């Protein structure tokens, strides 16, 4: 029996993204959710990069949750780690203003988030268009 995991996706793995059908087409879509304001999303052209930032000082990331089996999660993990991402688990996601799910997200390690000292993160909800 495969263990199921909640995976929060915000870029090319979302419905309509060019990697969705490759990795998540056969997994269970659980809905659109929002992260806590603990991240910064950078539009890197063909895909977004998300960095964790100090709790409560970042942006709210809009994404989708998929319930994935452990084998598929491992396949996605290998792909994401190959691109430099780390898996972060137990992020809290809301729907309608209330915490509804805990999931894993792939984000770049915080040490790669290099910005000028006067850089200000634009607050609010951000979403990457596929």
Residue ranges of model-derived segments:
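Glycine-aromatic micro-motifs
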Residues: 2-130
């Amino acid at each position: 029996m495969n263990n199921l995991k909640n995976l929060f996706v915000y870029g090319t793995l979302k419905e309509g993204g060019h990697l969705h059908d490759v990795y998540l087409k056969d997994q269970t879509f659980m809905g659109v959710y929002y992260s806590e304001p603990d991240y910064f999303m950078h539009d890197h052209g063909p895909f977004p990069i998300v960095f964790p930032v100090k709790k409560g000082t970042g942006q709210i990331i809009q994404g989708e949750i998929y319930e994935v089996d452990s084998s598929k999660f491992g396949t996605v993990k290998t792909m994401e780690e190959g691109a430099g991402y780390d898996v972060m688990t137990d992020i809290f996601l809301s729907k309608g203003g209330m915490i509804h799910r805990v999931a894993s997200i792939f984000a770049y390690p915080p040490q790669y988030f290099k910005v000028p000292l006067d850089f200000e993160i634009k607050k609010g909800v951000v979403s990457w268009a596929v």
